[in-house]
Amino acid sequence: MDNLFSIAERFGTPCFVFDEVQLEARMRAVREIVPKAVGLCYSIKANPFLISAMRGLVGTLEVCSPGELEICRQMGVPADMVLFSGVNKTKADVERAMDLGVTHFTCESPLHIRLIDELAAAFDPGHHG
């Protein structure tokens, strides 16, 4: 408890404190329960401050906005580790993600499927859905 008081004195309150050792232990416990063929994904909207800690614990980081994508870019997250999700993806959002090398997207509608397929074909002329 003294440690928390010293953290509050140093950083002020409110202050969020994360135990990365405990986080890693819990993620390893999840990994032991889930079949190896199942990939683990962390949605950074839950807490973008945990990106660095989660990078080594999951195979994929999910982003749902251009802002979250930019945070990952700035933190050096490899594009092949990013899943771009979200129902409000625009053409510009998908193009930017593809420019950065993102290749994994969720499709929430037939419109999204067409949009991503068309843009993927433009980025890779050999691709055709």
Regions found by a protein language model. Give the residues of each.
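A charged N-terminal "starter" segment
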Residues: 1-129
